[in-house]
Amino acid sequence: MDKNNKIASRVALGALFAYGNATIAPYSEQFYVGGANSIRAFTVRSIGPGGYHPAESRYSYLDQTGTFRFEANVEYRFRIFKSIWGATFLDAGNVWLMRKDEARPNSQLELKTFPKQIALGTGVGIRYDMDILVFRLDFGIPLHLPYDTERSGYYN
């Protein structure tokens, strides 16, 4: 755009396959989304897989990984003063399982449910750019949850 206004975007896709006699990929290699470098309106590993939503538990994040990942971000950055920048952003994505898992319903990747199972978040942030290092502080809010909340509309 110009030296005081910028647009940054990113798309990340990933697929993970088990090999040898394994039926699933190791947990440490599986994908997860959410957090400061992902979908900023959600905490780390709090989304997915698919439309699955675990019961409230201290350990629920352990189940929220998948073998397929889609993630997209777009961010508008504007200069406030010298090295201080403001930003608005929109993040989207989720993880899914490539195989059916009875213990985690609605977690398998299916084309018909794909759009409904995309988590959306938006927010604002401030950046301090020192040329070799950027400090940032972002605040995000969820716009759409990928699981059923029994509410309608996007801001649920």
Which ranges hold each PLM region?
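C-terminal transmembrane beta-barrel domains of outer membrane proteins
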Residues: 1-156
